[in-house]
Amino acid sequence: MGGCTSKPSTSSGRPNPFAPGNDYPQIDDFAPDHPGKSPIPTPSAAKASPFFPFYTPSPARHRRNKSRDVGGGGESKSLTSTPLRQLRRAFHPPSPAKHIRAALRRRKGKKEAALSGVTQLTTEVPQREEEEEVGLDKRFGFSKEFHSRVELGEEIGRGHFGYTCSAKFKKGELKGQVVAVKIIPKSKMTTAIAIEDVRREVKILQALSGHKNLVQFYDAFEDNANVYIAMELCEGGELLDRILARGGKYSENDAKPVIIQILNVVAFCHFQGVVHRDLKPENFLYTSKEENSQLKAIDFGLSDFVRPDERLNDIVGSAYYVAPEVLHRSYTTEADVWSIGVIAYILLCGSRPFWARTESGIFRAVLKADPSFDEPPWPFLSSDAKDFVKRLLFKDPRRRMSASQALMHPWIRAYNTDMNIPFDILIFRQMKAYLRSSSLRKAALRALSKTLIKDEILYLKTQFSLLAPNKDGLITMDTIRMALASNATEAMKESRIPEFLALLNGLQYRGMDFEEFCAAAINVHQHESLDCWEQSIRHAYELFDKNGNRAIVIEELASELGVGPSIPVHSVLHDWIRHTDGKLSFFGFVKLLHGVSVRASGKTTR
């Protein structure tokens, strides 16, 4: 059982309608679940056109940029985003490399055209200034000594709502330090949300700065016109540029260190309660031109704080990297892991896993299509590499690996066995559900935990040790608090993770050993994705039948599950109970493992 991998896709034998080499009809009729905020067609998407976006600034640019797209006065969710890049090609490419190179060659000219206001987009869609909300306070409390302390250099980058320049500190502790300064005009901050976005970006950078794979934050300044964010200057270029230099393809051993660095910083962010929400190759920079230079995550303009039991609902990010649950407006940190899966797919094969001619078509592909693992080079890559990418790209976020788990996947672990694995904050969500579960479900989870495979046990042992068990080998509320406090940043306080710990009050007066921790932390949906699930669940039921099963009437079962009085329990739960002896049936056992009682839910959405 130690060799279990994830189940192959049930549709792997079918042709992927969005895979390279197929014909692509124009798809404009897709909309997310909330049609009131569905994407607004752009002029280039309204008819057949040789233009299609390769990297779009956001899957919801109608929300973030209405003034540009439809002349409206919509709110801007982000002040920094990647400019729209359009590529002049009519047919679906097998690899992004060739025409991205063409786009890069044209980038300078397009920037100049954008600055002069003569791009195709601006000539077809007149722009209007967004109306500013009344009574906005644009004071941030940052230092106002920017011009006396910093000497600005040339512009090195530009987004929709700001631009970046090289600069040098003229005095103070950082005298002589060359930095990058992100400049955000206050005239662009036309809503309270936009102002809060800037404030939150600075908070996140300040709190998380210091991680080796995250851009170093130095200081924030403001004057009457702008906000200035001084950060580390990374001179090695974007990860995207390195991908292009290799012709859009990495070997497995070359891809691993890139993916490890991305996973490291994302796992750290998630541990601190921060979700990035815009992970893509453009948002990772190398510190120098050297081949083995460090990779740094940048652009936290769309990032947010999130608790383990909290879900976000605003659509942000970049179309090719956006997770299905983001389009459904209910997501958490797993959405970042999906984006890493897309990056890993591109690194290993040079193509995007989801493609269409229009933004709405991309969204449909993300929601409905399965990425192809049949075309070269996938048949020639290792089974571990394919399993790794597939487990990052499960459409059901409950089955998807976390960033910490991905660092312990056999494909990664075989490359580097001496990594510091961050604590997986989502384990607290599993523990909360376990502690609030009925005694019957706890017994079922304990039985299932006896069937864990070697890789799962190794991962849980690592996570258990990070919670600093006491001399008796038990974790308690005190050991958990101390373990978190030793690694906490201000971001963890902002995301209210310490408050969430109060929900683990079942550990207030007792400890939890490793055996019970396995039952509490096991992810049933992830375990189900393994190809040994059928064998595992049958064996677990046998153990449960011997040690935990008992006679139970339907009304008691309904009460334990938290089923309300409006539910016809006899018809719903009839098959859950074995008619011969009144004990839980195999069907009921499986359902009980998957089901979470009303008492164990209580997740919040914002």
UniProtKB/Swiss-Prot annotation:
One of its GO terms (cellular component) is membrane. A lipid is attached at residue 2 (N-myristoyl glycine). ATP binds at residues 156-164, 182. One of its GO terms (molecular function) is protein serine/threonine kinase activity. It is found in: Membrane. Activated by calcium and calmodulin. Autophosphorylation may play an important role in the regulation of the kinase activity. May play a role in signal transduction pathways that involve calcium as a second messenger. This is CDPK-related kinase 8. The gene is CRK8.
